[in-house]
UniProtKB/Swiss-Prot annotation:
Protein name: Biosynthetic peptidoglycan transglycosylase
GO terms assigned for molecular function: pentosyltransferase activity; peptidoglycan glycosyltransferase activity
One Gene Ontology biological process: regulation of cell shape
Domain of life: Bacteria
Naturally occurring in which organism (per UniProt): Neisseria meningitidis serogroup B (strain ATCC BAA-335 / MC58)
């Protein structure tokens, strides 16, 4: 019995260590190499297949300097205003999320920063549990320790979901506006950013009043968005 208990404890610990070693190796690789596809992309494409949707993956890597500053500012203004200064976690946002989750009795809000969102996109799935959030935090800490802010943001810009099968700034710019990501205007960047929290909902409701309102809010906040210091775009 004692041996069985030891195995029951050792097995999940071993899996955790192995997975994080695998993740860390990939984080090191992604400092210089673009991901072929992310875990979230694979999960989504499998989901679409199971739903009987005829969706092809549209994912086009674009270097950081060739993505519009307008889009960078819009995303920071909307998703993570403190991105340039924090170490991967917005503790005020996390505390607010914990309160909302406690009040609802479910894991709904995450207080996720851009770095945390990237950790999820690269390596995890869309499930909402405290275990998954813990793994997300561990990956975020590893990534922030060995990857500069520009690269984290570059990976994020290229992995965001914007429509059915459409991932990354370049694919989204071509899909919605038939232009490269480098040429996005402030209005276009704000509208793309407004889709980020619920891309598939807005894909099905493109004329949503909520989308228009969110676009206007992003436009107002863009002027105060702070990019990473090394960004000379």
């Amino acid at each position: 019995m004692f041996r069985i208990i030891k195995w029951l404890i050792a097995l999940p610990v071993g899996i955790f260590i192995f997975f994080n070693a695998y993740v860390y190796g990939n984080i090191i690789t992604y400092r210089a190499v673009a991901p072929h596809r992310t875990a979230f992309m694979s999960m989504r494409m499998k989901q679409f297949e199971q739903e009987g949707r005829d969706v092809a993956l549209d994912y086009r890597w674009m270097p950081y300097k060739r993505i519009s500053t307008n889009l960078k500012k819009a995303l920071i203004a909307s998703e993570d205003a403190r991105f340039a200064g924090h170490g991967g976690f917005d503790w005020g946002g996390i505390q607010n999320a914990i309160r909302r989750n406690r009040n609802s009795g479910k894991v709904k809000a995450g207080g996720s920063t851009i770095s945390q969102q990237l950790a999820k996109n690269l390596f995890l799935n869309e499930s909402r549990s405290y275990i998954r959030k813990g793994e997300e935090a561990a990956i975020t800490a590893m990534m922030e320790a060995v990857t500069d802010k520009d690269r984290i943001f570059e990976l994020y810009l290229n992995s965001i979901e914007w429509h059915y099968g459409v991932f990354g700034a370049e694919a989204a710019s071509r899909y919605f506006y038939q232009i490269p990501a480098a040429k996005l205007t402030k209005q276009q960047a704000a509208k793309l950013t407004a889709r980020v929290p619920a891309p598939l909902y807005y894909a099905d409701h493109p004329k949503s009043k909520r989308l228009r309102n969110k676009t206007n809010i992003v436009l107002k906040r863009m002027g105060s968005a702070e990019l990473p210091e090394s960004d000379t775009d």
